[in-house]
A protein has these predicted regions:
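Short, hydrophobic alpha-helical packing/hinge segments within bilobed ligand-binding/sensory domains
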Residues: 1, 28, 176-177, 237
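Extracytoplasmic ligand-binding site segments that recognize negatively charged/polar headgroups
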Residues: 18, 24-174
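Hydrophobic residues within well-ordered alpha-helices
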Residues: 4, 31, 176-181, 227
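Mature extracytoplasmic/periplasmic domains
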Residues: 218-219, 223-289
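A ligand-binding cleft/hinge motif common to bilobed small-molecule-binding domains
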Residues: 28-30, 187-206
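Periplasmic-binding protein-like
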Residues: 61, 75, 154-158, 205-226
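Conserved C-terminal helix/tail region of periplasmic/extracytoplasmic solute-binding proteins
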Residues: 178, 283-312
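Early extracytoplasmic/lumenal segment of secretory-pathway proteins
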Residues: 1-30
Length: 312
């Protein structure tokens, strides 16, 4: 990203050194607002016909993609529990709070600004705020204070019952997995719905581990590739983006033995055989996908969380 910005600042409008990149939502917004990306090409790819357009493939962190990004994988915030320990998991923020009170010290979340920790804050915010439509736009100070008030009230109630009484937080989801395996925690968190399946296969989680989410839905997103406006080989970049959408590539990528990255294809649009294979590699019984807040909320949430809870 820095290279693209540097070349633009130097006036290099053609012959750029970057042809295709995997970009996150915050960086996409930055590049798009600066007019540094090609637009209108993604849905012209031949393999777009297989894409599941019920997924958020036309927006990235609530920013319309306008054909400037091609999807190639999905993700969704997902809880993990052990069926032998937690056969009935919490299904709402309120029942999660009740679960934590009933099982003190066994619930936690990764310390923001860890990506998954911040996603957990976003998840709670979406479900607790009385004004979810405000999350579609970047916040100003007044909006932020009003919309997030229920979140901080909830966390103030939750934290005393967390692992280490909410005075310390795991640095990563991997640390949570280890604590779940050791039976210290009752829940772990991931942003890959296939994560539990992968970790069971590798022996990093017990065979009784399973994925679940809140009944109303869990936030999810799509990861994309994009082409800089000054790309030197944009035609070749589109060939690669199209390959990433091919059924063969998506099936291999979805294989837990290879990566286990969720597909962005609609199984019903695939030929027999490929359809069944893809369905077998997709986690079952996932909750609905909730759109993420606008990218402008991320840093604001992280900074306020650190101000309130990060000095323990």
């Amino acid at each position: 990203m820095k290279r693209i910005q540097t070349e633009a600042a130097a006036g290099r409008k053609t012959g750029g050194s970057v042809d295709l990149l995997w970009v996150n939502g915050e960086n996409f917004r930055t590049l798009k607002e600066a007019n540094l990306l090609q637009t209108g090409w993604a849905e012209t790819l031949p393999n777009w016909r297989y894409v599941d357009t019920q997924l958020p493939v036309r927006e990235d962190f609530s920013v319309p993609t306008e054909g400037a990004e091609s999807p190639w994988g999905g993700a969704q915030l997902t809880f993990i529990a052990r069926r032998d320990v937690t056969p009935q998991p919490p299904q709402t923020p309120q029942t999660l709070l009740e679960f934590a009170k009933a099982n003190p010290g066994t619930v936690t979340y990764p310390r923001p600004p860890d990506f998954t920790g911040t996603a957990f804050l976003e998840q709670l915010l979406i479900m607790l705020t009385p004004d979810p439509t405000a999350l579609k736009e970047a916040p100003d100070d007044a909006t932020f204070a009003r919309v997030t008030a229920p979140l901080w009230q909830y966390l103030d109630a939750l934290h005393p019952y967390l692992w280490r009484e909410g005075k310390d937080f795991p640095p990563s989801p991997a640390r949570m997995d280890a604590l779940l395996k050791a039976n210290t925690l009752r829940l772990s968190l991931t942003f890959n719905p296939a994560h539990a399946q992968q970790k069971i296969a590798s022996g990093d989680l017990p065979a009784s581990s399973y994925s679940f989410g809140f009944r109303e839905g869990m936030i999810g997103n799509v990861h994309f590739v994009t082409i800089p406006a000054n790309a030197n080989a944009s035609a070749a970049a589109k060939v690669v983006a199209n390959f990433l959408l091919s059924p063969d590539a998506q099936l291999r990528k979805a294989d837990p033995a290879v990566w286990g990255d969720p597909s962005v294809l609609d199984p019903q649009k695939l030929p027999d055989g490929q359809r069944e294979t893809l369905q077998s590699r997709m986690p079952q019984d996932l909750p609905p996908v909730l759109a993420e807040p606008h990218a402008g909320w991320v840093n604001a949430l992280e900074q306020e969380w650190l101000h309130r809870y990060g000095t323990h």
